[in-house]
């Protein structure tokens, strides 16, 4: 499984919204400018995140997006699966030896567990720690 810019930028969007909880709606333009990313590309990613209930859109002159939940409960796995699809390391395992199938399954489960056990709040702690050093 290769996490593409979809997953990486999806995490960027949601982390920025998590950082700014309480600041009101945040525009994609401000995230794009702050992170030097394409606003147009972020617009393509926000729809699936909104449809999945991870973010919420606020209309109006001062509209934008807010995180639709507690950063302690939204996981990296939620975001990656929404934008990338299921976590698959090997396309087909039927033709593999039992030992190889076991390896691929353990690897997939390890990746899945890390993504599902890492919340936005966890990632925010790491970003704050790295900004302090």
Can you say where each PLM-predicted feature lies in the sequence?
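Beta-hairpin "wing" of winged helix-turn-helix
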Residues: 54-67
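Residues within the DNA-recognition helix of helix-turn-helix
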Residues: 45
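Key DNA-contact positions within bacterial/archaeal DNA-binding proteins
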Residues: 40
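N-terminal helix-turn-helix DNA-binding core of bacterial DNA-binding proteins
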Residues: 3-7, 11-37, 66
